[in-house]
Regions:
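Cytosolic-side membrane-entry/anchor segment at the start of a transmembrane helix
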Residues: 1-53, 120, 172-179
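Hydrophobic alpha-helical transmembrane segments
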Residues: 41, 156-157
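Hydrophobic alpha-helical transmembrane segments of multi-pass integral membrane proteins
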Residues: 12-13, 45-49, 98-101, 130-140
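Transmembrane alpha-helical segments and their cytosolic interface motifs
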Residues: 119-151
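Hydrophobic alpha-helical membrane-embedded segments
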Residues: 38-89, 164-168
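Cytosolic/matrix-facing juxtamembrane and C-terminal tails of multi-pass cellular membrane proteins
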Residues: 169-206, 221
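Membrane-proximal soluble regions of multi-pass membrane proteins
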Residues: 63-118, 122, 195
Length: 221
C-alpha cells in the first residue's frame, strides 16, 4: 500500500501542477489543460509499463545461470552492508512491499534456513530482484524521451525521479538480505563439511575395528 500511496500522491500533484502550467491557466508549458492532465497519467503509466517489461524480460528471457549468487556483481561486501546499516535499513525495510507473491516464491521469511538447496532458490530470486530493481531505477528516465519536450521539467523528470526512488529501496533491501543469507549459506556448508568429516572418521574407525576382529579370528584359527 505504501507504493500505491506514493505513486497516487505523486501523480495527483503532477496533474495539478501541469494543469496549472497549461494554457488554460498560466500558459507556461504551451499545452491545453486537458492535455496537461492526460500527459501526466500517460507518463506515470509509461514508467509502470517500462518496469513491468524489464521484470518480465529478465525473468522469462534470460538464463538463470546469469543470476548465480556467487558472481562478483551479486556479492555484497562488508562496506556495502555498513552503508545499509547507516541508512537504518532495519527500521524501514519491512514497510516496503515484497513482490514474491507475483513470482510464487515469497521472500518474507526463510522457510528452511538449514537447507542450502532451498537457499539456492532464494538466492536466485534475490538476484533476479536486484537486477530488475537496479535497471528499472534508471530505465525510467526513458520517459524523458517519450513525453512532450515542453513538459520535461514539469512532468517527465519528476516521474523518472519518483520511479527511481520507488525502485532503489527494494534494491537496497535485497542486497542487505543477500549479505545475511550468504553468511547463513556458508555456515551451512561448514556444518555439512564437519558432519561429513565426522562420518568419514566413524567409517574409518569401524573399518579398523572390523580389520582387528578379522586379524584376531585368523590368529585363533
Amino acid at each position: 500500500m505504501l507504493f500505491v500511496w506514493v505513486i497516487s500522491v505523486a501523480v495527483t500533484v503532477l496533474a495539478i501542477l501541469n494543469a496549472a502550467l497549461s494554457d488554460g491557466v498560466f500558459g507556461v508549458i504551451g499545452v491545453s489543460l486537458g492535455k496537461g492532465v492526460l500527459c501526466t497519467f500517460y507518463a506515470a503509466a509509461l514508467a509502470v509499463l517500462i518496469d513491468a517489461f524489464i521484470a518480465l524480460f529478465i525473468r522469462r528471457a534470460l538464463p538463470a545461470k546469469w543470476f548465480y549468487h556467487k558472481k562478483a556483481v551479486f556479492t555484497v561486501g562488508a562496506g556495502e552492508k555498513k552503508f545499509y546499516e547507516r541508512i537504518k535499513i532495519r527500521k524501514w525495510k519491512d514497510k516496503i512491499p515484497e513482490w514474491g507473491k507475483f513470482t510464487g516464491f515469497s521472500k518474507n521469511e526463510i522457510a528452511r534456513p538449514q537447507d542450502n538447496a532451498y537457499l539456492e532458490k532464494y538466492f536466485l530470486e534475490l538476484c533476479y530482484g536486484e537486477t530488475i530493481h537496479f535497471i528499472s531505477a534508471y530505465a525510467g528516465f526513458a520517459v524523458l524521451l517519450l513525453t512532450p519536450r515542453v513538459m520535461l521539467f514539469s512532468l517527465a523528470l519528476p516521474v523518472a525521479i519518483v520511479n527511481m526512488f520507488c525502485n532503489l529501496p527494494s534494491y537496497f533491501i535485497l542486497r542487505y538480505n543477500s549479505y545475511k543469507l550468504e553468511v547463513l549459506f556458508k555456515n551451512n556448508e561448514k556444518r555439512a563439511a564437519r558432519e561429513a568429516e565426522k562420518n568419514s572418521s566413524a567409517v574409518a574407525e569401524n573399518s579398523v575395528s572390523f580389520s582387528s576382529v578379522n586379524s584376531v579370528a585368523d590368529a585363533a584359527n
